[in-house]
């Protein structure tokens, strides 16, 4: 049954109390109107529980914003949700349109730092988050007498002539009363030769989920620091700090322990507010995990980032024989869930 306002409801009971379910839960589509965000499409989703999030068909079907009862869950950068026409492939130009948000997808041919592999150049984190979706479909309807289901889906084709033809089908689902949504992704090689394919879910948690009162709660068996600063502060990998101007970023590669169902949940919890957010995923599909921690003023964010390959550049993956290869006609499936943690949730 739909749990709303500390009570369970059937379809008929809610229909009697409102003329349109959008009064309680549903989707609204609109376009941004000015600056580099002009003409970017947003789908705003409300579940009625206080959980609200946005889906951006113009930018990889990613999640540029989410909140719960007015509390933001994610970090948002100074760039805004830049229109994909402004994408800069070279070097670290990707950062000029990196909004952060609750989710920015990285891939599909490469991720990590700029590099050259087999005569092809790749910018930071590749281009899937800048590709507009086709075949976008929004459904919001009663699935049965007790479930008002919300579903948003679309197709993202990363391709070029004489190059890869990789298609990401993404479906995002939630329901009235929910405090989470689920992403079901399928990557298909629609070309005729084997292609390297990688995906990383760059989940960016921000204030007030992230604060000096916050800790990471994750089944981490091992943390490998990336770089000297991360190594020097490794003992505090799971502790958040107050913002400091100009403080360098830190990254840690984690080995996670899956539960009895093969799932991994990593969360950031503000102990003072008894409030937090999490990412949950299937370890078999996404066996690698990177933590991105930056406690700098303005870039005050912690990324929890599951992926299907180690977060190193494509040329390094090839050198280590760790490229994940998708055969012609083959598909891979991934499932990720993002949601809220609060002691008062019912």
Show the residue positions of the predicted features.
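Surface-exposed acidic/polar loop and edge beta-strand patches at domain peripheries
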Residues: 1-182, 194-196, 205-245, 250, ...
